[in-house]
């Protein structure tokens, strides 16, 4: 999750010890073993570090260049949950990150941030723009014991169990529900300028925040739009570089 003190506050082993000093050398070894192929160093930021750009830059200083930092998704009363004040800080941080990335690119030391990867000339087809990741229909999560779920974030939620690897999909009702979950399934999305970038958002995030896969995770929505704004700004700036 970036800085040692941030990572070790939550990424602990069974004995409660922080993991930073053990995982960083292993991450470096993994990236080296990739032999130049792509990878992503992914972290999560919480109420403890809304200034998450410091963690992104820390990863970059360690030598990692393909990075992703995701906002935490949890119940509003969870100590890790982002507050309304945090959201304003995070939005400012996204701008700081975009400007820093442009500077690094000019200096010949670029880094990639997953959420700023935006193709304005090609990009996904209209079906993908509407349907998004395809959880529950185009792909599923398979548990070690053979059960099928719409995606890994639903594993353990029995009502979302689709079937198993022996009998296949037997819960057609749930699959149909996911098939109809798209950018046009939510009233809140009807007039949103970003709906064909987010495809209605993550079904799992919506469910965990609202109790329905057709709900809208408002905080995530707000941050997503800010990320797209920054990504578009970067595209414009890169045209002049």
Residue map of PLM features:
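Radical SAM enzyme [4Fe-4S]-AdoMet core and its adjacent flexible, acidic
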Residues: 5-24, 28, 32-139, 157-158
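Short clusters of hydrophobic/aromatic residues that line enzyme substrate/ligand-binding pockets
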Residues: 7, 133, 162-165, 178, ...
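C-terminal accessory region of radical SAM enzymes
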Residues: 89-122, 152-199
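Active-site and channel-lining beta-strand-loop segments
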Residues: 138-153
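Radical SAM enzyme core and accessory elements
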Residues: 145-147, 184-241
């Amino acid at each position: 999750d970036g800085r040692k003190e941030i990572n070790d506050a939550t990424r602990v082993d069974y004995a409660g010890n922080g993991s930073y000093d053990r995982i960083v050398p292993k991450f470096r070894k993994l990236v080296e073993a990739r032999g130049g192929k792509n990878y992503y160093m992914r972290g999560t930021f919480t109420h403890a570090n809304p200034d998450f750009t410091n963690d992104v830059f820390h990863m970059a200083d360690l030598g990692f260049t393909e990075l992703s930092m995701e906002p935490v998704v949890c119940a509003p009363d969870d100590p890790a949950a982002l507050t309304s004040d945090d959201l304003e800080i995070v939005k400012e941080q996204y701008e700081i990150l975009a400007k820093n990335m442009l500077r690094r690119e000019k200096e010949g030391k670029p880094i990639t941030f997953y959420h700023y990867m935006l193709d304005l000339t090609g990009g996904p087809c209209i079906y993908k723009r509407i349907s998004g990741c395809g959880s529950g229909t185009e792909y599923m999560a398979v548990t070690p014991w053979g059960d099928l779920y719409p995606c890994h974030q639903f594993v353990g939620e029995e009502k979302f169990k689709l079937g198993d690897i022996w009998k296949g999909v037997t819960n057609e009702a749930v699959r149909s529900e996911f098939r109809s979950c798209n950018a046009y399934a939510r009233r809140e999305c009807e007039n949103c300028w970003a709906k064909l970038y987010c495809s209605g958002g993550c079904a799992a995030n919506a469910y965990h925040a609202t109790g329905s896969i057709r709900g809208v995770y408002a905080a995530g929505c707000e941050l997503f739009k800010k990320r797209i704004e920054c990504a578009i700004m970067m595209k414009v700036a890169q045209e002049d570089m």
